[in-house]
């Protein structure tokens, strides 16, 4: 279990009060220094945390009981979590193991006391905590959690109260990425010592190599590394190593911040000679449309990441999709983007895989479907899924027939089914075509779950026979619909009576469980408790 996590505060330490179990006059007559083994345990009376000043510190601050993130004063610090195992050693005897619990250290099941073995003065007492739970810590792969080594050292006379001051034995490296496509970076690595081992009371780093960093947040990566090493190179997205303009020398218990600029290749759409601009699998590109309407199409292959920057595409003259996603891909919105659909083609279609759309409220994507019987607007083909994390997105499928604003659309064969639709944020306005849902399935189409966890969503069912605002089209089906988030606002409407606002369209065959969680606002009603059931 990862026990130590980080918070932003000031550099500090952890103090543990240690007390002998027996008074000195109970032990010997004063002439014998060595004590019987395993007779006189060291006990922990209490734990406190004190602070000390330092430049760019990394420490702890009261009254935290866990290593958690905090933004206080823009500084980093750490604190214990219940269950942390702390080793304590007196001299060279076998270390004891204690468990942190509610601001104190206890000897839990499976633990062992540290024992006094001598009545000597100035005995060395060491204590340490590692994220691995043993005396060898692997620093090479921190993608699933940060590595920690926290140590304390002092001297004390037998049977005296002892205060242990803990500090980080490792250095923290924090990489902050900048640039238009910095959010496309999935992984960052640096070079350093890949292991840290306790030997004869000293922690040593060894085995120089790659250290994979932990993604703390979008565009932010961290790793805790052995000090005394100069970081000279970094790489992103498993690419080649890039040299830093200035090497970073690592010091223990310090935060070392590195700003890394990320650039990508830009394609100016007007310079492309062909009708189709293809983004190959695995590529990261910026497609700059310059704000001018162009007679172009875009094909994006599997695992590609593309920024759409002021792209405006006219409706193709043939029955094709204007933007086509052929596998799992990411779209990052920038500026104003307007995509028009062909007579029998969608403005944007996901053929297979999962499309993820990111953007801010200032980044707009407008998709307009044309008068079509075999297309939708933001279309999802058989098994394809969609995740929207942000952006201002308009999916106007009101001119189409048999296609939803966002979701499945009729393709000329029975029951095409999308995989799932997830909306985590953004401003979304989706209008379904004839017989189709605003968000969900088109006419005679099916699909999986619809999950909304955030954002401001407006969904309008289509006309003719009618579709739900969110849910199914006529003779269609969908999975469960779950809407949550205290700041989530949903407006779901229909143009045909008899259709659910959230649930079934005209003669809808099946809709899974509709759940509106407490805190969500739907059609101007803020739910104070969970609601289960379709919204008519």
Located regions from the model:
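A composition-driven surface/loop motif
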Residues: 81-82, 120-124, 190-192, 224-227, ...
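Sec-type signal peptide cleavage vicinity
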Residues: 2-4, 8, 22-266, 275-276, ...
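Sec-dependent N-terminal signal peptides
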Residues: 7-15
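Exposed boundary/loop context
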Residues: 14-15, 67, 231-232, 246, ...
């Amino acid at each position: 279990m990862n026990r130590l996590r980080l918070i932003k505060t000031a550099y500090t330490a952890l103090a543990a009060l240690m007390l002998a179990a027996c008074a000195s006059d109970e032990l010997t007559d004063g002439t014998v220094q060595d004590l019987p083994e395993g007779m006189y345990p060291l006990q922990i009376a209490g734990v406190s945390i004190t602070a000390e000043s330092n430049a760019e510190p990394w420490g702890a601050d009261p009254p935290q009981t866990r290593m958690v993130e905090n933004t206080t004063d823009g500084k980093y610090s750490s604190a214990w979590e219940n269950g942390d195992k702390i080793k304590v050693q007196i001299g060279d005897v076998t270390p004891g193991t204690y468990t942190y619990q509610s601001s104190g250290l206890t000897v839990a099941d499976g633990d062992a006391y540290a024992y006094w073995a001598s009545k000597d003065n100035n005995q060395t007492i060491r204590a340490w905590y590692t994220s691995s739970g043993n005396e060898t810590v692997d620093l090479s792969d921190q993608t699933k959690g940060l590595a920690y080594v926290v140590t304390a050292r002092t001297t004390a006379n037998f049977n005296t109260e002892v205060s242990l001051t803990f500090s980080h034995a490792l250095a923290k490296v924090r990489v902050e990425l900048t640039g238009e496509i910095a959010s496309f970076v999935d992984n960052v690595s640096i070079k350093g010592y890949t292991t840290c081992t306790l030997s004869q009371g000293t922690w040593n780093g060894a085995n120089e190599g790659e250290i994979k960093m932990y993604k703390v947040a979008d565009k932010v990566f961290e790793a805790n590394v052995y000090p005394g090493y100069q970081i000279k190179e970094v790489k992103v997205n498993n690419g080649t190593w890039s040299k830093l303009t200035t090497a970073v020398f690592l010091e223990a218990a310090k935060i070392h911040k590195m700003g890394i600029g990320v650039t990508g290749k830009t394609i100016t759409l007007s310079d492309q000679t062909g009708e189709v601009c293809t983004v190959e699998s695995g590529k990261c590109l910026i497609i700059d449309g310059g704000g001018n309407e162009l007679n172009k199409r875009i094909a994006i292959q599997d695992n590609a990441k593309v920024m759409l920057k002021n792209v405006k595409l006219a409706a193709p003259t043939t029955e094709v999709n204007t933007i086509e996603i052929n596998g799992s891909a990411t779209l990052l919105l920038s500026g104003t983007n307007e995509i028009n659909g062909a007579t029998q083609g969608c403005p944007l279609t996901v053929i297979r895989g999962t499309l993820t759309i990111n953007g801010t409220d200032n980044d707009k994507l407008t998709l307009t479907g044309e008068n079509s019987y075999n297309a939708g607007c933001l279309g999802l083909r058989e098994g394809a899924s969609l995740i929207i994390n942000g952006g201002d997105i308009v999916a106007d499928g009101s001119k189409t027939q048999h296609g939803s604003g966002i979701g499945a659309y009729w393709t000329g064969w029975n029951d095409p089914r999308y995989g799932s639709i997830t909306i985590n944020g953004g401003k979304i306005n989706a209008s379904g075509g004839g017989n189709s849902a605003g968000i969900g399935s088109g006419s005679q189409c099916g699909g999986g779950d619809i999950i909304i966890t955030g954002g401001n969503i407006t969904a309008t069912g289509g006309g003719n026979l009618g579709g739900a605002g969110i849910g199914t089209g006529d003779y269609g089906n969908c999975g469960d619909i779950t809407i949550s988030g205290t700041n989530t606002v949903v407006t779901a409407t229909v143009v045909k009576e008899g259709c659910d606002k959230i649930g079934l369209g005209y003669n809808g065959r099946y809709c899974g469980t509709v759940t509106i969680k407490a805190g969500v606002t739907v059609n101007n009603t803020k739910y104070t408790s969970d609601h289960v059931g379709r919204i008519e």
